[in-house]
Design a protein with these regions (language model features):
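N-terminal alpha-helical transmembrane segments of multi-pass membrane transport
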Residues: 1-81, 91-98, 109, 432, ...
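Extracellular/periplasmic helix-exit of transmembrane alpha-helices
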Residues: 116-124, 128, 237-253, 264-268, ...
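Alpha-helical membrane segments and immediately flanking helix-loop junctions
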Residues: 60-93, 119-143, 156-162, 270-319
Length: 500
């Protein structure tokens, strides 16, 4: 039995490496570039998007939650450990140049986030209880001319989303949370705290919110996410300020290494331009989730006059997540390395090892990135350890809340509203399991599902790109953003049966 589990795990590792390889990267990057062109470089509308995200709701528009609530719920799932550890891992494996490519993918990813949200809003439906439902599965089913293919891709997308929510959205996050608590030097006797006790507390805290549904989750995220993001950015800016003399050198280093492939600080190690590209694209693409189709699942519930308004609001999430927060994280890390020769020496030695891509595993590289981020944050006197613990607690908790709603929408599509309560119970079990141990196998399985979400979602965006381009021109470029979309939103299914 043990041999079977080892073989199965090895097979899962191989599949994980394949699906997160260059094929997926080029699919996502190609979609980003294509939709940037099709939408007339929608990125230039970021100021409008930010303004809309904090505007008051139209009392006559249809929807369940505010535009800001939908945005913060999506950000709750994306602003997380990836912004700390993910950027550090990209730096560790691809050199400082990876940060430049990470930032660039965020800029172009804005167009894909806009596009996937637009079709989610355009093809959204209501269930028998009047609850708004949307996402790639409804766009695939309602928007495709070939109904059979559309239905198949829709079911696959929903299935992969549900599976991913149990791993990346639940057990992986709770495992990180429990680890942060038990290893914290701020809590006396932290290492002696039973993980099952932490599991019970965390599970109850998550249950209190998600049992209340999307409205309860969005209300919590509206309060938690802005505070969480501001706190983290402020701490990064403090470190950058402490190393202010190295800020210009850090910017020059990042840009230079992006096109030369130099990886080591003052050394001869060269990761190569392709590694800088690879890890920059990977960490950027998967930090903001543009192209995965996750955020539109919640965005479809927003109160909005027309599809373009909420699509603009959603794309501002990618701007904040990758273009702003990941960039600030990168500058914090690079200035810290330039200011601390001893830390840079450790980084250089790690780079020598990480040039052997065989160690690019969920444990090895992830741990290396975490160690690098930890070392940089500890440069803040007294507050350093507190920043890490509080930040990680907030990030992991909010991620669990956000992903619970993604899975909720996927299960509703597959099984109807009757599947929601059983799903929530299973989700909470995975939260508890993550606290007491979890496992790398769960990470890899959910990682694969997370990656496979992108395939049907990108197909939907590309096939329906004409609809997106036409709608963008009508609502945005012809000045109709304040007008109401009078197209009736269909009601599907019944209370006890699937909505498809």
């Amino acid at each position: 039995m043990e041999a079977f589990i080892e073989s199965f795990s090895a097979g899962v590792d191989a599949v994980d490496g394949f699906v997160w390889g260059w094929a997926l990267i080029w699919l996502l990057l190609g979609t980003h570039l294509f939709m940037t062109i099709r939408t007339g470089f929608i990125q230039r509308k970021i100021p409008t998007a930010i303004k809309l995200s904090v505007s008051k709701n139209d009392p006559y528009a249809e929807g369940d939650i505010s535009q800001f609530g939908a945005l913060t719920t999506a950000l709750a799932a994306t602003i997380g450990t990836g912004n700390i550890v993910g950027v550090a891992t990209g730096l560790l494996c691809g050199g400082p140049g990876a940060i430049f490519w990470m930032w660039l993918t965020g800029v172009f990813g804005i167009a894909t986030k806009y596009s996937e949200t637009y079709i989610s809003m355009k093809y959204r439906v209501k269930d028998a209880n009047g609850r708004m439902l949307g996402g790639a599965m409804y766009a695939l089913e309602r928007g495709f001319k070939h109904k059979g293919l559309g239905k198949l891709l829709a079911v696959l997308f929903a299935l992969f989303t549900a599976i991913a929510s149990f791993g990346i959205g639940a057990s992986v996050q709770s495992n990180s949370l429990a680890g942060a608590l038990t290893s914290s030097s701020l809590v006396p006797g932290a290492s002696e705290i039973p993980t099952w006790l932490i599991g019970i507390v965390v599970t109850v805290l998550v249950a209190i919110v998600i049992i209340g549904g999307l409205k309860k989750v969005s209300k919590v995220c509206e309060k938690l996410v802005p505070v969480m993001a501001i706190f983290y950015v402020a701490c990064c800016l403090v470190i950058i300020g402490m190393n202010g003399a190295y800020l210009w050198d850090a910017i020059v280093t990042i840009i230079t290494c992006a096109f030369t492939g130099q990886a080591a600080f003052g050394g001869a190690v060269g990761s190569g331009i392709m590694l800088a590209l690879q890890y920059g694209f990977k960490r950027g693409l998967f930090s903001n989730e543009s192209g995965l189709g996750s955020a539109p699942l919640v965005a479809a519930s927003a109160i909005s006059k027309n599809p373009a308004r909420q699509a603009l609001v959603s794309m501002s999430g990618t701007f904040w997540d990758t273009v702003v927060i990941c960039l600030i994280t990168g500058l914090m890390l690079v200035t810290s390395l330039l200011a601390n020769p001893d830390l840079a020496a450790i980084y250089n030695n790690t780079m020598l090892a990480s040039n052997d891509l065989s160690i690019d595993t969920a444990v090895g590289i992830f741990s290396g990135g975490a160690a690098l981020a930890t070392a940089c944050f500890e440069s803040i006197p007294v507050l350093g350890p507190l920043v890490l613990v509080v930040g990680l607690l907030c990030f992991t908790y909010s991620t669990m809340l956000g992903w619970s709603q993604y899975g909720d929408r996927a299960i509703t599509y597959l099984f109807g509203t009757k599947g929601i309560r059983p799903y929530q119970v299973v989700f909470l079990l995975f939260v508890f399991w993550g606290c007491i141990g979890g496992g790398d196998l769960v990470w890899n399985l959910s990682d694969i599902s997370n990656a496979l979400m992108a395939v049907p979602n990108c197909i939907a965006v590309l096939v329906l790109s004409g609809v997106i381009a036409k709608g963008t021109k009508y609502w945005i470029y012809e000045g109709r953003l304040e007008e109401e979309d009078t197209t009736p939103i269909p009601t599907v299914g019944t209370v006890d049966h699937p909505n498809v």
